């Protein structure tokens, strides 16, 4: 069910599926085998094999990284690396020679570095780098990082395995497979990716917390860890498993050098400021370039010597271990393992890693020409009784220059056995220039331990699983070269009394359960390696002696298993990063689609109301025009009707005037003739004047009546139009209110919908994180089970060896003790021969009882060891389960906090939106009321203009529509 949900989360719709893309720096139309010739295999990385290739035309060498990809999505995972390599042209960064995608395989051709990786060089030479060599590497790495960070690129996987060497003594920064190329200068990342031991604290936190992203300062932390790795061969906390080291990085103080006194103050100060847990105060690469530790570097001679030594011709000579006299040396050379256990527990080292793998170094007789001197200071200090006391290199780790013990953990690595017993002697012979101090100072003799593992570094150079040695902390500076060379030879000439040391040695081995050196020395061999090389005309010869045993194969196997474990974790990281990228892409697409849909919905709603308003205005205009037309028609008809009536009235009025004239005539005719003429004349004049006055008054009254009728008609039309305009404005404002209300409702709905989508996306993101975390936890449990199984098998094998070896030891010891007892009886001469035989018989019976007790003690010890181992394995699993549960609980708790914070943020946004909505509503109402007032003002002004007296020829106007209708 969970997997189905996981598939659902990452599923894209049909139109969202990506098609094949053409990339700028990847050729698809060319078979790389036609251009390059494969010469051999260089190594096997986490995502594919690396081959040495040669260009068929130019003869240029390249490292071909061949990766099988199943889909375009997988191909895109490597495009970032190709683009970074293609755009980074820097002398200390590997160059891209070409990239091909052909037949389902991606070929990345990069610059070939014959010197190999720095971690492989340390394995080959059985030692770390000297401080001058570290200075040059650090300087060149800082210049490369400054260039990368200037291009907004975060490497995210800095370590010695990703620093390649050229024969000219320059480095090449490689492996950009997990690098990030930002689009903005201040952009930060939240991907949990990289190799655990080198991760910065802010990167570790991103495993469960994505809200605390990191930037390019994470590379500065990895640089500091890499410098410690080059000084001590292994990174800090290498003895812990990857899950525990993540907690260690996040909760502990920044790591430091195990033996700070062996290194300069500049180096220690550089590490102190580079390994700052606060990324805000951590310096940048440009600032670190001004530090005194690297600012004085002007030559790469130290690295040229290093590469020359690593690539030098090696002559090996194997000598069988001697049985005679070696047992005595072994007794005095073996340190008490109890001290090791105490040192380990005091420093918090895992008991499961220390219970059966205590470091034991045995000494090798030195040539007579070399003086026998202590190793690293007070190695052979006289004990209280005057007898010499030898200290192994493992004990030297926990002592300072004054011989006092300091809390330094044993140099071991889970889950690798480090029982290898190594003694290294270096002899340098300078033939051309015998007084060349620089060459001698740069390669001081070392006392080495077996390197537990190679930290599983997938590099583009040669990955060598050499039987290298682990240098004790501190590649010496010139100030310490004399002390280091004086301590390079461990004296083995002193021996203890055989009779007293034999039983002590046996009891020590039986008590601790460790392998007896007397038995193991019979099978050990001494490997002598002589390297001869020339640097600047100076021939240098270095001879290294190392005791090899069957544990070498065990160490190599453990180293390989550790590489496999880290490779599995890195594959999980890569897949997790791919899933996170796909999910982020899907979420961005969902948000983009949602915003686009929101815009479309809002635009559609606005368009709907705009169309409604437009229709309303058009209808209003049409209605007003129709009303004006109707008004014009009514005016004409009314005017015509009134004129007709007035014409009839006028005709009647004329008739009345005629009657009046006739009456005047009749009244005049009754008068005398003489008077009649005078009266006729005066009556006609009076009648004419009266007629004119009456006619004028009648016409004026008719005109006034017509004007009053037209004004009344116009006023009625104006009132109708005003009512229509008011009604239209009210409808328009109601539409505007509905429009704004709909938009506000959509905005609120969109806020809710966006919140739900973001909330669901957050849940999907945490679901994916839980899914990836559970897969990682399952892989860690699987690795822990394999580790516990290996520990059980190793314990069983060791117990079987001890059980088989005990009878031989008892027989030899019994013969020796019997001979010594008989010799003591003979010397003392006590009693007769029969008494002596009786004493011998009693002594023999006591020896049988003692040997039987030893066998029972060994059996009990083996049972206790097995019980302790089972308990330890269960404790390891329980501790791992507890840590995983805490991490899951932390992830769930963080998810709850994020969801709560998201809800609170949404509620706050909704509250702010509602607070802003009130003034928006108020502004809308004010605007609508203002438009109403403006309309009423316009109506009033129009009415006043209509009532003002006008000239007879001037037509009254109310609206522009009626201007042509006044007639």
Swiss-Prot record:
* Activity regulation (record text): Inhibited by the pyrrole-indolinone inhibitor SU11274 (K00593): intercalates between the ATP-binding Lys-65 and alpha-C glutamate (Glu-81), resulting in a partial disordering of the lysine side chain. Also specifically inhibited by erlotinib. Slightly inhibited by gefitinib.
Q: Name one GO biological process term.
A: protein autophosphorylation
Q: What is this protein called?
A: Serine/threonine-protein kinase 10
Principal place where this protein is found? Answer: membrane
Q: Where is the composition biased (Polar residues)?
A: 339-364, 378-393, 431-454, 486-498
Q: Which residues form a coiled coil?
A: none
Organism listed in the record: Rattus norvegicus
Q: Which residues form the Protein kinase domain?
A: 36-294
- EC numbers, comma separated: 2.7.11.1
């Amino acid at each position: 069910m969970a997997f189905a949900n996981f598939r659902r989360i990452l599923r894209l719709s049909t139109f969202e599926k990506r098609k094949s893309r053409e990339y700028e720096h990847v050729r698809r139309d060319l078979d790389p085998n036609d251009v390059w010739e494969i010469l051999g295999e260089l190594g096997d990385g986490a995502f594919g094999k690396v081959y040495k290739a040669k260009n068929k035309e130019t003869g240029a060498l390249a490292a071909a990284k061949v990766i099988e990809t199943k889909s375009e999505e997988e191909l895109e995972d490597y495009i970032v690396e190709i683009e970074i390599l293609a755009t980074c042209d820097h002398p200390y960064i590997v160059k891209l020679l070409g990239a091909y995608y052909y037949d389902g395989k991606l070929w990345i051709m990069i610059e070939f570095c014959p010197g190999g990786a720095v971690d492989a060089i340390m394995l080959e030479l059985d030692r770390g780098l000297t401080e001058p060599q570290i200075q040059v590497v650090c300087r060149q790495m800082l210049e490369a990082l400054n260039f990368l960070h200037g291009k907004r690129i975060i490497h995210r996987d800095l370590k010695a395995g990703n620093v390649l060497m050229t024969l000219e003594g320059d480095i090449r920064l490689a492996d950009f497979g997990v690098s990030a190329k930002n689009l903005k200068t201040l952009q930060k990342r939240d991907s949990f990716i990289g190799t655990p031991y080198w991760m910065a604290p802010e990167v570790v936190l991103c495993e469960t917390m994505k809200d605390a992203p990191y930037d390019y300062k994470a590379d500065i932390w990895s640089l500091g860890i890499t410098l410690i790795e080059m000084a001590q061969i292994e990174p800090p906390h290498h003895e812990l498993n990857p899950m525990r080291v993540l907690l260690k990085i996040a909760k502990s103080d920044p790591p430091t050098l195990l033996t700070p006194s062996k290194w300069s103050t500049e180096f220690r100060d550089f590490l102190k400021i580079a390994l700052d847990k606060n990324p805000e105060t951590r310096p940048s690469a440009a600032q670190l370039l001004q530090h005194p530790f690297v600012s004085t570097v002007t030559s790469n001679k130290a690295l040229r010597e290093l590469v020359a030594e690593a690539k030098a011709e090696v002559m090996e000579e194997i000598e069988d271990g001697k049985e005679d006299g070696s047992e005595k040396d072994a007794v005095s050379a073996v340190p008490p393992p109890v001290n090791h256990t105490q040192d380990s527990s005091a420093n918090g080292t895992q008991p499961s890693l220390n219970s059966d793998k205590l470091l034991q170094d045995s000494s090798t007789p030195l040539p007579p020409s070399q003086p026998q001197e202590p190793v690293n200071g007070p190695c052979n200090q006289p004990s209280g009784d005057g007898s010499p006391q030898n200290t192994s290199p493992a004990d030297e780790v926990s002592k300072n220059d004054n011989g006092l013990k300091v809390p330094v953990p044993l140099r071991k690595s889970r889950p690798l056995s480090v029982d290898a017993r190594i003694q290294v002697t270096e002899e340098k012979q300078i033939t051309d220039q015998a007084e060349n101090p620089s060459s001698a100072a740069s390669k001081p003799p070392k006392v080495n331990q077996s390197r537990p593992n190679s930290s599983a570094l997938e590099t583009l150079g040669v990955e060598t699983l050499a039987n290298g040695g682990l240098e004790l902390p501190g590649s010496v500076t010139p100030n310490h070269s004399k002390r280091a060379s004086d301590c390079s030879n461990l004296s083995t000439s002193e021996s203890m009394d055989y009779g007293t040391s034999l039983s002590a040695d046996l009891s020590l081995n039986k008590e601790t359960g460790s392998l007896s050196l007397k038995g193991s020395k019979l099978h050990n061999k001494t490997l002598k390696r002589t390297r001869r090389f020339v640097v600047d005309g100076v021939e240098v010869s270095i001879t290294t002696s190392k005791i090899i045993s069957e544990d070498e194969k065990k160490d190599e196997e453990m180293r390989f298993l550790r590489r496999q474990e880290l490779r599995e974790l890195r594959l999980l990281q890569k897949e997790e990063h791919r899933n996170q990228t796909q999910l982020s892409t899907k979420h961005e697409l969902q948000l983009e689609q949602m915003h686009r849909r929101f815009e479309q919905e809002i635009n559609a709603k606005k368009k709907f109301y705009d169309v409604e308003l437009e229709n309303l205005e058009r209808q209003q205009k049409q209605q007003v025009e129709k009303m004006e037309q109707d008004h014009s028609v009514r005016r004409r008809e009314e005017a015509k009707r009134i004129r007709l009536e007035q014409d009839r009235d006028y005709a009647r009025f004329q008739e009345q005037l005629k009657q009046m004239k006739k009456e005047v005539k009749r009244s005049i005719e009754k008068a005398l003739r003489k008077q009649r003429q005078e009266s006729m004349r005066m009556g006609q004049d009076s009648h004419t004047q009266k007629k004119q006055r009456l006619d004028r008054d009648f016409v004026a009254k008719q005109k006034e009546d017509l004007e009053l009728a037209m004004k009344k008609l116009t006023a009625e039309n104006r009132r109708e139009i005003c009512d229509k305009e008011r009604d239209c404005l009210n409808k328009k404002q109601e539409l505007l209110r509905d429009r704004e209300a709909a938009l506000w409702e959509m905005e609120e709905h969109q806020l809710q919908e966006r919140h739900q989508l973001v909330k669901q996306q957050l849940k999907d993101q945490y679901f994916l994180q839980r899914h990836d975390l559970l897969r990682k936890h399952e892989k860690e449990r699987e690795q822990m089970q394999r580790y516990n199984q290996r520990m059980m098998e190793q314990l069983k094998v060791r117990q079987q060896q001890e059980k088989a070896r005990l009878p031989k030891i008892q027989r030899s010891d019994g013969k020796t003790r019997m001979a010594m007892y008989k010799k003591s009886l003979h010397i003392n001469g006590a009693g007769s021969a029969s008494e002596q035989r009786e004493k011998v018989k009693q002594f023999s019976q006591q020896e049988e009882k003692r040997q039987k007790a030893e066998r029972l003690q060994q059996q009990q010890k083996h049972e206790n060891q097995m019980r302790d181992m089972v308990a330890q394995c269960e404790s390891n699993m329980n501790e791992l389960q507890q840590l995983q549960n805490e991490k899951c609980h932390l992830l769930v708790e963080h998810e709850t906090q994020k969801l709560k914070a998201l809800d609170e943020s949404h509620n706050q946004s909704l509250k702010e939106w509602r607070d802003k909505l009130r003034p928006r509503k108020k502004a809308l109402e004010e605007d609508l009321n203002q438009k109403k007032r403006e309309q009423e003002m316009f109506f009033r002004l129009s009415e006043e203009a209509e009532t003002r007296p006008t000239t007879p020829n001037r037509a009254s106007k109310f609206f522009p529509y009626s201007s042509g209708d006044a007639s």
